[in-house]
UniProtKB/Swiss-Prot annotation:
Protein name per UniProt: Photosystem II extrinsic protein V
SUPFAM superfamilies per UniProt: Cytochrome c
GO biological process, one term: respiratory electron transport chain
Phenotype of gene-disrupted mutants: Cells show decreased but not abolished level of PSII and photoautotrophic growth. Wild-type growth in BG11 medium, 30 degrees Celsius 30 umol photons/m(2)/s; dramatically reduced growth in Ca(2+) or Cl(-) deleted medium. Slightly reduced growth at 30 degrees Celsius with 25 umol photons/m(2)/s, no growth in Ca(2+) or Cl(-) depleted conditions; no growth in a double psU-psbV mutant.
One family name in Pfam for this protein: Cytochrom_C550
Gene name in the database record: psbV
Cellular location(s): Cellular thylakoid membrane
Cofactor(s) needed: heme c
Coiled coil location: none
Main location as per UniProt: membrane
């Protein structure tokens, strides 16, 4: 009887597994993946691979301080689009974020943060950034600009 019961449960689980199918990652539309490239108004569309790579890098490296787009060290400045646009220089486009990840500056652009914020210019201080390529930095910057489109809580704009 016990064996019959186990076979029945296994059959039911197998049936549901084949009928339901596997869960896939969110399919992003082209319009969702299209983001500002530069201050001149140019745009770029990240590929699914670039988005996934940027997301992986963000989760592995950036979420230590920027979980869900918030900033652990300063709750007044997040990675929300409004805060990025309010920075000096603006950081609401891919090339500006790439520049920031190479040579970080304070929110007002006055102070050099190369010893305070992870960047690829100082691999001696931030070894986690040591092996990132230009493409990796581009991808994580792109992910940072796409993320607010995917989660209304990104950057602490709601429920914060």
């Amino acid at each position: 009887m016990k064996r019959f019961f186990l076979v029945a449960i296994a059959s039911v689980l197998f049936f549901f597994n084949t009928m339901v199918g596997s869960a896939n990652a969110v399919e992003l539309t082209e319009s969702t993946r299209t983001i500002p490239l530069d201050e001149a108004g140019g745009t770029t569309t990240l590929t699914a691979r670039q988005f996934t790579n940027g997301q992986k890098i963000f989760v592995d490296t950036c979420t230590q301080c920027h979980l869900q787009g918030k900033t652990k060290t300063n709750n007044n400045v997040s990675l929300g689009l409004a805060d990025l646009a309010g920075a000096e220089p603006r950081r609401d486009n891919v090339l500006a974020l790439v520049e920031f990840l190479k040579n970080p500056k304070s929110y007002d652009g006055e102070d050099d943060y190369s010893e305070l914020h992870p960047n690829i210019s100082r691999p001696d201080i931030y070894p986690e950034m040591r092996n990132y390529t230009e493409d990796d930095i581009f991808d994580v910057a792109g992910y940072t600009l796409i993320a607010p489109k995917l989660d209304e809580r990104w950057g602490g704009t709601i429920y914060f």
